[in-house]
């Protein structure tokens, strides 16, 4: 327990390894909404969040489970699903009159071509203004699912066409 004047107890979310408060402080000072991308074992979740004194407020959210409504038949946790979820998120954000955001990848490592950057690529291609470097985004072959179709052609089937048709269906939602 915290005994004595020199003992410091870190914040609970820091102790649990859930929040980097230094990075969070830098993102909040920017005074723009955050495009928060989180991965689970089964889904990709993208949210637009603003920080307020009472607590963070979610403005727009998109989950990769929603892709099934747009004709996507693949896994909801892979790179093409992240790309389509980012695109769906951008369409929802633009329809709700939120044209810009800054990327918040949380405790995920910033690795070239990662799923969080596939979601960023989908959002940027759909028209959301998010500052980024082009070199971090995954290649078009990966976001279309060509690497999956080449590895497992019997299971992936027509994944590339499925991703492209789902992307077209999502973009039709843009008002």
Swiss-Prot record:
GO molecular function: 5S rRNA binding; structural constituent of ribosome
PANTHER family reported for this sequence: LARGE RIBOSOMAL SUBUNIT PROTEIN UL18, RIBOSOMAL PROTEIN L5-RELATED
Entries under HAMAP family matching the protein: Ribosomal_uL18_A
Name used for this protein in its record: Large ribosomal subunit protein uL18
UniProt KW rRNA-binding keyword: yes
SS bond partners: none
Family indicated by similarity: Belongs to the universal ribosomal protein uL18 family.
Entry GO CC: cytosolic large ribosomal subunit
Ranges that cross the membrane: none
Quaternary data: Part of the 50S ribosomal subunit. Contacts the 5S and 23S rRNAs.
An example Gene Ontology biological process: translation
Function recorded in the entry: This is one of the proteins that bind and probably mediate the attachment of the 5S RNA into the large ribosomal subunit, where it forms part of the central protuberance.
Keyword annotations of the record: Ribonucleoprotein, Ribosomal protein, RNA-binding, rRNA-binding
Source species taxonomy: Archaea, Methanobacteriati, Methanobacteriota, Stenosarchaea group, Methanomicrobia
